[in-house]
């Protein structure tokens, strides 16, 4: 009876492993993230640098990869290709002489990314597009809320890039 209990405990413990909630099982040890550049019309002048910094910080916080300037086992580079403000959620003004107005404006950011995985080329990709948007009240001044909007949009795009590269989702 003690032997059966011992075998049960051993089987239970061997079933327990170290699991990652991000799904990251990385064999590489180094990563190089080149500075993204801005090819979008509009947006703040430091938008691409801000994106690069947030991306680098995210990989630092969520992996054990050592960041190197170039020739990492994993390599990421890209460009911010689109910064677009679009009116959404039209509302009627109630007068004939004034056209309908938008209650919300949508800020959309698009990034094109190339990724090289030197440990397994099957995971590499070139010029993959990642995009996300945030809507905001049309009454608000974009310059007053732009930094916050960019942070939230970048957070989602970076999560998508992370999942497409090292998390393999």
Which residues does each predicted region cover?
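A structural "domain/chain start" motif
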Residues: 14-60, 64, 69-72, 119, ...
